[in-house]
């Protein structure tokens, strides 16, 4: 089966084009675990399926390196925009993409047939009062009102009994179609912070489906620095939805402007937030190589 390795700022996935090469009898969860292994597989943060859609131009499914399915990935969305245009699946420069978090519109900046950047309409950010991903709207009964402002959850030093004794740092819970816990850091974002705090917050029982965890330092009103522990994949070079969540949390706190550049390990993303808390993300995407891999067929695909 043919695949294409791509990355968005180092957030790398193995992409399968099921529009050009349709196949259904595959255990995608098992395949994601096997192929994502960087020693015995192709290596990546997971696999992404580019699929036909009845309602949109294309559909995206994402499986993390541990086999779990994710609702949305901003970096993968940009990569799909580049792939479908440069491989001739569409001539559109505005693409409707069906995801597990709803329809996302991709705006392609094309120069001489090459997609240089992709701007993704990420949708409306929700900053929650509690850890149950409940949509809380303040000062307005109309969810689209410009008067609505997200409410931030600020945990005090809360003792977490399970899975181990750990002091949960102050965080903000943001829904970008997938869950995010944003930790604002005053000083250096350390390896210990990411690799010890990240998995513990990810698996905290108050996040029943787990969460992505962002560690964020405000550089100035137009810049953030971020490292991310992704649910199901561990630390990655970049996370598009995480960059959006970080920008929303810092803007809602009054720490930054509504347009920021987020510096990640793999590069920079530009995030903008409008008066209705609709978020846009702009960045590049890279095709690394194409290949073929043997894929076992199963009677009961997942």
Regions found by a protein language model. Give the residues of each.
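Short, flexible, solvent-exposed loop/turn segments with mixed acidic/basic and small polar residues
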Residues: 3-5, 170-174
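Amphipathic repeat-derived elements
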Residues: 83-86, 127-128, 137, 145-146
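Membrane helix-loop-helix hairpins that form the core translocation module of multi-pass transporters
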Residues: 117-125
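Short, charged/polar, Gly/Pro-enriched secondary-structure boundary elements
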Residues: 126-130, 290
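Anionic-ligand binding region
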Residues: 132-136, 140-163, 169-172, 181-206, ...
